[in-house]
Swiss-Prot record:
Catalyses which reaction(s): L-seryl-[protein] + ATP = O-phospho-L-seryl-[protein] + ADP + H(+); L-threonyl-[protein] + ATP = O-phospho-L-threonyl-[protein] + ADP + H(+)
Enzyme class: transferase
Family: Belongs to the protein kinase superfamily. Ser/Thr protein kinase family. Haspin subfamily.
Protein name stated in the entry: Serine/threonine-protein kinase Haspin homolog ALK2
Gene Ontology annotations for the cellular component aspect, listed alphabetically: cytoplasm; nucleus
Name of the coding gene: ALK2
Reported modifications of this chain: Periodically phosphorylated during the cell cycle with a phosphorylation peak during mitosis and hyperphosphorylated after DNA damage.
Amino acid sequence: MNFDAVADQQMTDRRYFALEVAESDDADSSLNSSSMGSPAVDVGRKVYKITSHKGSAEDESQSFFTSSDSPTSKTRPVGKTIENDDYYGKRSSTGSSLKQLFNKININDTAHSSNKENVSQSVLSENKLLSPSKRLSKQGLTKVTNSKFRTPLRPISNQSTLSRDEPVKDFRSLKFRSGSDFKCWGDEKTSSHVHSSSVNSVNSFTSTTSSSKWKFWKNDNLLSRSLSSRSVNDQDPNFVQPKPTNSLQKKSSISSFHNSIFGGGKHTEKKRNSGFIMPDHQSTKELNHKHSSSNLSFRSLKHKTSHSSLNKLKVRRKGNTQELNHPIKKTCQISLPVPDQVSKDKIQLKLKNSTSLASLSSEVTPINTLDYNDSILQQILQLCDVKYILHDLREAQSLGLFTLNTRSVQLSHNFWQTYHSDMQTSLICKKVCLGALSDLTTSNLISLHELKSLRLIQGTSGVANLLQAYVVPSNQCENDQNLILYLFFKYQGTPLSRCSNIDYSQALSIFWQCSSILYVAESKFQLEHRNLTLDHILIDSKGNVTLIDMKCCRFLNIDNNKASYTRLDHHYFFQGRGTLQFEIYELMRSMLPQPISWATFEPRTNLLWLYHLSSSLLKMAKKAVVSGALNREENILIELTHLLDPARKHSKTIFKKELVIRTCGDLLSLKGEIMQ
């Protein structure tokens, strides 16, 4: 065996180990001092010359190269420093120059208490072989610096750094728990280059920090690259890493920590091979950017699950304006089922028997709004005396029609009193604006309904007789396209709302006249006035009563036997509160069958308006009478009001017949009994 080559290789490795620990300036000074043979002492670094116990270099060489079979020769264990040189044989001649350099290096691993993360103290045994030098004297407690890690430029005394690096020591203790692993490496002699001191320091860290808690997976972004073991990366490639325990396999961040420490890329591998050690803060940044496989899988899963829902939300929010070409909208296609012939027949049969307005048997058909208005206007013109629209009032005068003049007096919002020049008689003119939005109580359809009712009941006593009707443009402004319907009646007196000084006898006369008129119209045409206010009752000088304004009435058309009515579900009829008039509207709607059908004939609605009339007459007569004494007419009027009161409770009598009033005919049949 060539012992010279082995000794030279060990000495060369030991020299590389020492040069890596010492700083460049201190190393140069040490080399200069060793070449001069002077025992240079560096007080700041605590480097002392170690004197040899042997006399000559030849004896050292001979003792170093002693055969391995001799009892005094022992194998130097890997990872232990040299404490006693007496057990080695002869050394080579080339090691004499290196001996002087090693004698100047104090192998000291004593660390300050605030710098525990960089250095460690290892107490060595005297019975173990520590160095390839053969003639070094026996020293007590010789120490070796952790030559694998560079000495920091300034001492680290921050306690947070100590707590940050302690988990790394625990992890290293997991990998290398006992010193037997290192002995196996030395016995196999397969390692090309093993740094014993660094491995020993890691082993010492394991013994001192074995009681610390394992929380390094929570602070993996704070790990220092400087504490990663380079000796592990430089170890034998055939070495099999020990598997982690089952408890650590359950932690998802163990894999990320292992990959960040042992799975370095090409860039970090080049730095390690070149002897460059990355600073702590730079390595921390690199480890901070490395994510574990569990975190990456969780993020990708979260992104996949939320991607489709976000796209659907965008489609709903943005609508059809911005997402016409969206791929999701292209796939969202709805296919409607196509019914067979049997299903079609069933649907048609149900629609024919349906009572809805859109049923197949209904006469209601879809039509354009303009066409609908033109159709209503043509029907109005057919009921007028002039079958076309006049240009202006001058044309009406030329045709001999009644017109409004300067002597006309406005009685109400729509009624005027005028005089004819030839007849010297007064007339009542009703002015209706067709298609105007200002008056919600009128429309083309309502005007048509009123014209039909007037033409139907014309000649009936107590109802205003229509004399003339025609349509003229408004001409209030240049762009005005509204039409005005003029209705002329014979003068029948003034509205009851404007009358004053009415006594109880006159009040009773007005009440019974209105009841008789409604009874005739009710019996003949099934007519319900449905809007008999004081303005729609005219009183002449002789006390005769005339009913006007039939736009809200309901009647039966004799020609086609169909009911004609006006819907009273508009909010205009129910917007008032606190007055008896609007309470009557509510009571009328409650009397109609549910669902509400305004075409149903309900004669009790006329009784409701007679109750409204008796209550109003009772108040008006009290104001006119000065004396406080009650008379007979007043008692009768009070009794009528009580009988027509819809809130009256029917008394249960045995010997007296209960008065049941459901129509105006029933009320008139009780007239003789009430007036007695």
